[in-house]
Curated annotation (Swiss-Prot):
Domain of life: Eukaryota
InterPro entries: UDP_glucos_trans
Reactions performed catalytically: delphinidin 3,5-bis-O-beta-D-glucoside + UDP-alpha-D-glucose = delphinidin 3,3',5-tri-O-beta-D-glucoside + UDP + H(+)
Family named by the database record: Belongs to the UDP-glycosyltransferase family.
Posttranslational mods: The N-terminus is blocked.
Organism: Gentiana triflora (Clustered gentian)
EC number per UniProt: 2.4.1.238
Protein name per the record: Anthocyanin 3'-O-beta-glucosyltransferase
Tissue spec. comment: Abundant in petals and barely detected in leaves.
Key word Transferase present: yes
UniProt cross-references to Pfam families, sorted A to Z: UDPGT (PF00201)
Binding site residues for an anthocyanidin: H16, A389
Record keywords: Glycosyltransferase, Transferase
Length: 482
């Protein structure tokens, strides 16, 4: 039998790029010829991440295409959604991505893969794959729960008769009773008013989801069995749950090479953690796209200090104040250093290495799905602080269904990545202490540790994710190609 050749084309944002690279590495480790597609400016991250797989002899490579920045008035070199600082820039970025269909088709014509795995935002990938008679698999970068709950809310609009944005509603037609408020979900009033492009894009995404060959999900059966079953049996959707994809990086070197270069030496970070007791450190990080204003960062610093817990805090550039000395509380950094109470990392951190360390007992997170899964794989309970995208659904999975998280009380969904609503220091301190210093927190942390073992077993030989991938590869290998 000829070697199966699969193209992988992630949406151009770190939260989509990293799991897709992991997926390509996983496929290649199972004998597949894996080819990743990206733009010129993003290629360095891809090449670094696959280097060890190539050394081990796996058939994995990267092809690049040009991103049409200039055609849409975007700055030269602007090739990831993470760089967006306004709604207008994000909209232009999405429009520019539509023009990637033609160069993708040129690569499909030249290299003739047997299947295409493309991100859900590339809804036009169905048409591209159909031109060459190959199946298009849609990569959904969230959980089945979030996918199903969000679809139910979009379809049923259970918020439409509410008198206030803060009034609660129950998400209809799903296995669990999940309560949200209108302000916590994207609604047409907020995301699509005067923006027909966004309306049209989500309509196209929904249609492509229904028409594609099937959906690949970065999750595992034991994490959300009711929703995996619901997806297949009630929605009738062909889906393969092959995660957690980050566990394909089972060597320290793989983990360290994943994503951007850390702004702290990994050994320095791990040495600091080695000096701490098990379950004593709170890790605080809000991913690659979240940007808080100065007032919120000030409250976060005060909340961490008032909690009395040791912490590692990954600080990205503040959106309205480049100099962190302007928003750090007076003497904060000095007190943290002198008391050896915390480690502040400015920029990018080796997140997976940190979460896997036994000293880490809690993860304050925006609930992006990659970060959520990395916390699950590390056996770390979460303080949930969702901001945008599907993150409020991910929060509900952690706090209400799995019961491995405590909410900080975030109430406002936003389309842009800055949060105008300030979560007060008292709420932050209370949530952290509830998880780290109260009896209830012990049970929550124990449930999180049990999930870690289930995640590991899922990707091992005979595990649910391993078996789902095996079934998919058999199916793709027997697909009748032109």
């Amino acid at each position: 039998m000829d070697q199966l050749h699969v193209f992988f084309f992630p949406f151009l944002a770190n939260g989509h790029i990293l799991p897709t690279i992991d997926m390509a590495k996983l496929f290649s480790s199972r004998g597949v010829k894996a080819t990743l597609i990206t733009t010129h400016n993003n290629s360095a991250i891809f090449l670094k991440a696959i280097n060890r797989s190539k050394i081990l002899g796996f058939d994995i490579s990267v092809l690049t295409i040009k991103f049409p920045s200039a055609e849409f008035g975007l700055p030269e070199g602007y090739e990831t959604a993470d760089q967006a600082r306004s709604i207008d820039m994000m909209d232009e970025f999405f429009r520019a991505c539509i023009l990637l269909q033609e160069p993708l088709e040129e690569l499909l014509k030249e290299h003739r893969p047997q299947a295409l795995v493309a991100d859900l935002f590339f809804y036009w990938a169905n048409d591209a794959a159909a031109k060459f008679g190959i199946p298009r698999l849609l990569f959904h970068g969230s959980s089945s729960f979030a996918m199903i709950a969000a679809e139910s809310v979009r379809r049923n609009k259970p918020y439409k008769n509410l008198s206030s944005d803060s009034d609660p509603f129950v998400v209809p037609d799903i296995p669990d009773k999940i309560i949200l408020t209108k302000s916590q979900v994207p609604t047409p009033d907020e995301t699509e008013e005067n923006n027909t492009h966004i309306t049209e894009m989500w309509k196209n995404i929904s249609e492509s989801e229904n028409d594609c060959y099937g959906v690949i999900v970065n999750s595992f059966y034991e994490l959300e069995p009711d929703y995996v079953d619901y997806c297949k049996n009630v929605l009738g959707r062909r889906a393969w749950h092959i995660g957690p994809l980050s566990l394909c990086n089972n060597e320290g070197e793989d983990v360290a090479e994943r994503g951007k270069k850390s702004d702290i030496d990994a050994h320095e970070c791990l040495n600091w953690l080695d000096s701490k007791n098990p379950d004593s450190v709170v890790y605080v990080c809000f991913g690659s796209m979240a940007n808080f204003n100065a007032a919120q960062l000030h409250e976060l610093a005060m909340g961490l200090e008032e909690s009395g817990q040791e912490f590692i805090w990954v600080v990205r550039t503040c959106v309205d104040e480049e100099d962190e000395s302007k928003w750090f509380p007076d003497g904060f950094e000095k007190r943290v250093q002198e008391n050896n109470k915390g480690l502040i990392i400015k920029g990018w951190a080796p997140q997976v290495l940190i979460l896997e360390h036994e000293a880490v007992g809690a993860f304050v997170s925006h609930c992006g799905w990659n970060s959520t899964l990395e916390g699950i794989c590390g056996g770390v309970a979460m303080v949930t602080w969702p901001l945008f995208a599907e993150q409020f659904y991910n929060e509900k999975l952690m706090t209400d269904i799995l019961r491995t998280g405590v909410s900080v009380g975030s109430l406002q969904w936003s389309r842009v990545t800055t949060s105008a609503v300030v979560v007060k220091r008292e709420s932050i301190s209370k949530a952290v202490r509830r998880l780290m210093a109260e009896e209830e927190g012990v049970d929550i942390r124990n449930r999180a540790k049990a999930l870690k073992e289930k995640a590991k077993k899922a990707v091992e030989g005979g595990g649910s994710s391993y078996s789902d991938l095996s079934a998919l590869l058999v199916e793709l290998s027997s697909y009748p190609h032109n």
